[in-house]
Structure formats: structure tokens, C-alpha cells
Amino acid sequence: MILLDNETAVALPKFISAQKLLEDKFILELLPRNNDKNNEKIRKTKRTTIELTIGGDIACFVKPHSDFVCDTIVRGIVPKRHNGLESPTVFVLITDNKFDFYNITETADKKYRILDKALERIIVKRVFTIHQLAHFLIIDLEKEIAKKYKSKLVIITGDFFLSDPQISKEDKDWLYPQMIKAIKKVKDSIILVFSPTTLSNLVNYG
């Protein structure tokens, strides 16, 4: 894991059609939360399948379980034949203190047996302020993920510092729309946000 500091299907042979379906899609299965009523019964019957496409809407998963977060990140580099995205790298942008590096390596090692690949191809960058985050998203995001790392999957953790009481409402109201506009410009990657709260202008799940 690299840490950074600051036409119609029937007209085509079936195997080509299947490959095309896999090419730009990433399927995630969202389980009910642990605190749902009658949880055991719900877990057996109620699951949400989400199909994400490169250049599509930006999904925000609210209060996701750590296992879901880590599995999603690792599956970004897993081959398509094993329900992964087969991205050259996965870029993870951390804006909070709740990111579990150990769980990612555990998932890569024990579940998928690709620990070495995960350590090499999962790129992690941490930012500490809303201004650092805004600068990276607005100025550097596209060139970093498209040109340098060629990431088909980009993960952003946290709520863009919107819950930080030390940041003025004026700064939040000014910077947040610009950051969302910047990430929506990215057309060659799937961008997912894992946030403790729902976020405006994104497709929220959970």
C-alpha cells in the first residue's frame, strides 16, 4: 500500500457482450445496518445491489461498515472474473481519522490472497484541512488519478470537513460546491464517498 504525504448485444458474440458488460461496471451489495430491527431476518431477505459505472453518478455511502469499505477498496484491483474492477490502482483520499489500514491488508490477504498487489497498487493520500482537500480536488485530482496512477476507482473518506466546528460556515458554503464540481469532472473513474453523514449533490445510500 503506497502512502502519500500531504450496438445491440444480440449482434455480437456472447463472450464479447459479456466482456463489455464487465468492462466499465462495478457491482456492490449493500447489506442492512447492524442496528436494524429484526436484523437476522432482514439480512436474509433485504439487500441492495448497486451498479456503478465509470463516469456515472457519484455514490455516497453513509455510515458504511468497515468491512464494506475495505472489501470495496480491495475489489477495485481484483480481476473482473472475480467480480472486481481490475483497476491498475485504487486511489484512496482520507479526510478523517477512521480509516482502517490493517483491515484492508487483512481483506486482501485472507479473502482475496492478493496482499502484495494490494500493498503495491492501493494508493493512499491523507489531507488534514478543508483547504488542503479543496486544493487537491480542484487542482490535482484529475492529473493524479488519470495520468499518474490511472485509477478506475477513487475513494474519498469523510464528510469534506463539513462537520468541523473550527471551519466557518462561509468557508464550507464556498468550498464544498467547488469540490463537488471538481470531482464530477472526472470521467475515467468511479468515485465513491464514504461519509458519516448524507452529503448534498451526491447519490446517498444507507
Language-model features, listed with the residues they occupy:
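Short, flexible/disordered intra-domain loops and linkers
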Residues: 165-174, 201-205
